[in-house]
Every structure is written in C-alpha cells, then in structure tokens.
C-alpha cells in the first residue's frame, strides 16, 4: 500500500536524532521473487513469513520500521486465498505483539499518490480497504497511536516530536 511509509523511514535515516537506531523497510519485492504471493493472493505461509520478519524486528532495541504486525493482520484479513480460520488464528496470535511497539504511528495515505513499484497493488479500492482495515485494527487494539500526515518533511518533524516526548 503506497502511503509513503518507506519514504519516511528512509528519510529518517538521515536525521542525527536517529543515528543510534536500526532501520528496516519492506521486503515485498524480495519475498515476491522467492515465490511468496502478495496482496489479495497472499497465503497463510506467505503471511507467516511476513509475520516472522515483524516479530524478529521486535527483538531489537531502537528500531524504526515501515511495517508492523498490524500490516500483516490487515493483509491477511483481506486475502482472498486464505481461509477464514487461518486469518482468525494468525491474527489472534499477532494481537499479542501489538503491545510490543513503544510508539506506533498511523501514516495517513491522504495526499499520497499510489506508486507502481511493480510489486504493490495499484487498485485504489484495495488501498482504501487496507487503510480501513489498519484503522479498524488500531482502533480495536492500540488506542495510543499517533497519526501523521503531510509532506515528507512535515511527517519527519511529527515523528521527531513524538519520539522526543517518549525518550
């Protein structure tokens, strides 16, 4: 889903405030090249790969990532290939990891054009469905989420401000 999360994380790498942080960005293209189906074609096995990457990230201190277990939960819920019970049990397990994030940002897609990177789904309706699902999951399980939007520069400042208040 193209909302500028990877762009934001890559921009934060250049900020002196985050020099001691580890950064991780999406690996969808790499995983697709391994034969893992994405988007509406995603499978339980594929979502388990994504989930294991997100869980591994949570074992590190001072990490900034553009994906969370919430993304995995949303994409699993919207998969047309997964069975309902697979979605339920995967998401019921991932639910326990949501609290592991020190700060969780919801990055609004408002004003961001869908970018065709050859991997992500470019269907605007699907993008909206993913966004709505993410907001639903966040609303149910993580009340203290910070919404950021605007230009990349504005988003950087919003992240810096939130992190400065936390640390």
Residue ranges and their predicted role:
Residues 13-56:
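Conserved substrate/cofactor phosphate-moiety recognition/catalytic segment
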Residues 47-99:
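Glycine-rich phosphate-binding loop used to anchor ATP phosphates in small-molecule kinases
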Residues 26, 67-69, 106-111:
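Short loop/turn segments at strand-loop or loop-helix junctions that form parts
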Residues 80-153, 157-158:
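A glycine- and Lys/Arg-enriched "phosphate-lid" helix/loop adjacent to the NTP-binding pocket
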Residues 2:
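Walker A (P-loop) phosphate-binding loop of P-loop NTPases
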Residues 158-166:
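C-terminal alpha-helix
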Residues 8:
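Hydrophobic positions on the alpha1 helix immediately C-terminal to the Walker A/P-loop
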Residues 5:
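Conserved lysine of the Walker
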């Amino acid at each position: 889903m193209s909302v500028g999360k990877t762009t934001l994380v890559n921009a934060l790498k250049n900020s002196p405030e985050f020099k001691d942080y580890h950064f991780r960005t999406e690996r969808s293209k790499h995983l697709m090249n391994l034969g893992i189906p994405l988007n509406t074609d995603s499978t339980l096995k594929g979502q388990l790969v994504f989930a294991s990457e997100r869980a591994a990230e949570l074992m590190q201190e001072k990490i900034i990532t553009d994906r969370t277990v919430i993304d995995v939960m949303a994409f699993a819920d919207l998969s047309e290939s997964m069975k309902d019970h697979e979605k339920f049990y995967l998401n019921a397990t991932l639910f326990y990891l949501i609290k592991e994030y020190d700060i969780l940002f919801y990055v609004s897609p408002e004003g961001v054009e869908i970018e065709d990177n050859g991997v992500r789904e470019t269907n605007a309706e699907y993008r909206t469905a993913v966004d709505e699902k993410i907001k639903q999951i966040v609303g149910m399980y993580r009340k203290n989420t910070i919404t950021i939007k605007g230009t990349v520069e504005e988003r950087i400042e919003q992240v810096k401000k939130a992190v400065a208040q936390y640390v």
